[in-house]
Amino acid sequence: CAFGPRVPNTEAHRLCGTYIAEKFKSFGATVTDQYADVKAYDGTVLKARNIIASYNPDAKARILVCGHWDSRPWADNDPDSANWHKPVLAANDAASDVAVMLEMARLIQLHPLEIGIDFICFDAEDYGVPQWSDQAGDASSWCLGSQYWAANPHVYGYQARFGILMDMVGGRGSTFSKEGYSQRYASQVVDLVWNTAAQLGYGQFFPMRDGGYITDDHVPVNEIAGIPCIDIIPYFTDAPSGFGPTWHTVNDNMEHIDRQVLKAVGQTVIQVIYNENQ
């Protein structure tokens, strides 16, 4: 968050992308930058950068772990309309995803695996049609970086056993329901992750309840790339937004990050990975 909002086509975005790539390299990953010009809902051409950090790139058995790293350009869900055109710092949505992936990468460097791991930081996830726009909402206006990667993977014919997407995994008060598309396309992976969380004592963060269907980066991973992928995403039953009180507001900052939530998600996902390595 020290770089400021990571809005595509800005200097803060460019600098932060370089920082993320260099951190993965420092943890021993092979880093691939996938640059793409993607078109936003309003015709703006976004200079997108998907950052792929791989371990054991020659291993056939692979697991995909992903999240997005860009910031929402507009705080269009803010309770104060004066903030609707201001960019979002996006500590939870989704610097939290990248922070957890970087910590996993650090652990993998210390405790090497035999299976292959690909961390993907997707760009241009959060440039969807804003609520103040005259245009109708369009699901395809979101997740532009993952749509591009799913159609043009960094390795020809790329496959993975399964994928785990993390989105907003650090917000205070977060719990994670079983998201709809995840259950449709990858119910066994949902069960694997939720059962692992329960075994680790994190069942309060991963309740055994169904959530709604969320347009997120796992949808193109499932539908275009054909990789069964789940989404770990919060579901608030008692907030104005199901994604929590800071979603797409100027208050999505470090003050509202809970280390216990980050720990619950990170330890659960890394345990799933090491269990698959056995």
Give each language-model segment a name.
Residues 1-14, 38-42, 83-95, 107-108, ...:
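Second-shell loop/turn segments in exported
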Residues 32-33, 52-54, 62-67, 90, ...:
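Structural recognition of the beta-strand scaffold that forms the well-ordered cores
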Residues 2-58:
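A non-catalytic alpha/beta surface segment that caps or lines the substrate-entry region
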Residues 1-8, 21, 25-32, 103-113, ...:
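Sec-exported extracytoplasmic/periplasmic mature domains
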Residues 35, 162, 169-278:
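Active-site-adjacent substrate-binding region
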Residues 6-8, 37-40, 57-59, 69-73, ...:
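Solvent-exposed loop/turn segments at secondary-structure junctions
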Residues 11-26, 31, 96-103, 116, ...:
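Extracytoplasmic/secreted proteins, especially bacterial periplasmic and envelope-associated proteins
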Residues 85-188:
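Acidic/histidine-rich catalytic neighborhood of metal-dependent amide-processing enzymes
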